[in-house]
């Protein structure tokens, strides 16, 4: 494996551990890195979705007894058809616009929600989550940070949020992989990265689940926000300079 591949696999491990601790966020870091190293959406998003399917599946198993299964049914109503409608459009997407959109979504996700919990009725929240996953998610890959807010229910414990978000995200990523395949985009484009990344995210989930109760939430939040800010600034720079016809490389 090249040094770049090793670095990407390490990011996969850390991103899965991050999501196992916080419930979300790790996927945004991973897709941000895949775009930052120059992968086109037709390569980056199918690879990312395949990896995230296993990451979220392992997290679902870790929090299985806390899952609210009705949420998956509402999610599927919009989450099943949407990816197949949007998949053919991915090939025509401009990677630099996607970088800007993803950077904006990352920064917007860090704005505190009013009241801290989601007031939208459950069924509409989960149907909206399915729609966002199958539309915007087909281009930016990661949806956890902005879809995750729809799962912050006042009656749910932290473990229920993590487990239920994980099972819907696993379903969403599987649907995206199938939709990409139907549009002719194969997850085997980077098979040399896929297998080690899958192993890394499963290991990261196990480690993250163990650390879940040990990490200070205040310290974790500061570190997490710092990583996301740096990553979003890199994506913003790449997007703006790319649209302007300039190029640069930080990593």
Positions of the model-derived regions?
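Membrane-interfacial loop-to-helix junctions in multi-pass transporters
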Residues: 1-7, 119-124
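Residues that define the loop-to-transmembrane-helix transition and helix capping
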Residues: 42, 70, 96-99, 159, ...
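Interfacial loop-to-transmembrane junctions
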Residues: 69, 206-230
């Amino acid at each position: 494996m090249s040094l770049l591949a090793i670095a990407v696999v390490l990011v996969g491990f850390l991103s899965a551990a991050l999501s196992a601790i916080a419930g979300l966020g790790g996927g945004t870091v991973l897709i941000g890195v895949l775009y930052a190293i120059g992968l086109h959406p037709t390569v980056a998003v199918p690879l990312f979705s395949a990896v995230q399917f296993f990451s979220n599946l392992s997290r679902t198993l870790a929090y299985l007894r806390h899952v609210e299964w009705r949420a998956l049914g509402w999610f599927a109503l919009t989450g099943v058809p949407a990816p197949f409608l949007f998949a053919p459009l991915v090939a025509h997407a401009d990677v630099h616009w996607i970088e800007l959109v993803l950077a904006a979504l990352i920064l917007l996700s860090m704005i505190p929600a009013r009241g801290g919990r989601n007031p939208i009725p459950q069924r509409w929240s989960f149907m909206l989550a399915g729609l966002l996953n199958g539309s915007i998610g087909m281009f930016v890959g990661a949806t956890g940070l902005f879809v995750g807010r729809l799962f912050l229910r006042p009656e749910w414990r932290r473990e229920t949020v993590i487990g239920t978000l994980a099972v819907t995200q696993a379903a969403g990523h599987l649907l995206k992989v199938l939709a990409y395949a139907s549009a002719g985009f194969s997850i085997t484009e980077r098979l040399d990265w896929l297998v080690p990344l899958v192993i890394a995210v499963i290991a990261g989930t196990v480690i993250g689940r163990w650390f879940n109760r040990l990490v200070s939430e205040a310290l974790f939040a500061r570190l997490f926000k710092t990583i996301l800010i740096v990553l979003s600034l890199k994506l913003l720079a790449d997007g703006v300079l790319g649209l302007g016809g300039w190029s640069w490389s930080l990593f």
